[in-house]
Amino acid sequence: MQHRYICRSIVLVPAVLLALNACQTTDPYTGEQKINSASKGAAIGVAAGAVVGAISGSDAQERRKRAMIGAGIGGLAGAGVGAYMDKQEDDLRKQMQGTGVTVTRQGDNITLNMPGNITFKTGSAELSPQFPNVLDGVAMVLKKYEKTIIEVAGHTDNVGKAEYNQGLSERRAHTVTNYLVGKGIKPERTISIGAGEIHPVASNDTEIGRAANRRVELSLLPLKQ
């Protein structure tokens, strides 16, 4: 049986970030401040979803939601959304310690940033030798928290032709998605996206910046009722 994944070529526009008031706590593993949204789950999730979900778009997420519900995965409601994502975030931070993967939180959405030096060989969609171990840890946590949509986005720097970079980012996102599904993640939960070179997180004028832009991001969005 072949599984179908949503894989889209996209053009991003700048998003307006909303300032949200929430309780902040110090993460025991990194010392950084993070948002604890258990008490404000629904309100924060709606606002942040517009930002974190900008890559795949609401249509793709709605299709995943319907597919997940059809597969018997129930949604979250109210303050339970924030509490659920709090626990998932904590487990991911523990699992990703020492891997080079950063875990960030915005409202009810979690993003894993996987830098290019641990993900893929240069110019290739073949996994680097150390990357499967990282993905195994990610899959272990994601299987525990199945009430989340998983958006896998590949990103590149601007070296070479834009068309090539777009295709490479799509292949890399698809490779990661396939690997996670092979480890037991339900395909109904996944969205595979190639962002190409159009969403940099650093300047492409330096090697350090280009290295930062070569990455895979996993965005985890709660499945809400």
Positions of the model-derived regions?
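Short, low-complexity, glycine-enriched hydrophobic/amphipathic alpha-helices that associate
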Residues: T26-D91
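Stable alpha-helical elements in mature extracytoplasmic
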Residues: A47-A48, Q88, L92, F131-V134, ...
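Periplasmic OmpA-like peptidoglycan-binding domain that tethers envelope proteins to the cell wall
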Residues: H155-Q225
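Amphipathic, membrane-active segments
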Residues: M85-N117
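Second-shell loop/turn segments in exported
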Residues: G78-V81, T119-L127, A162-N165
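C-terminal motif of bacterial Sec signal peptides marking the signal peptidase cleavage site
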Residues: L18-A22
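Bacterial N-terminal signal peptides that target proteins for export
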Residues: M1-V11
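Periplasmic peptidoglycan-binding/anchoring modules of Gram-negative envelope and division proteins
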Residues: Q95, F120-G154, V181, A211-N213, ...
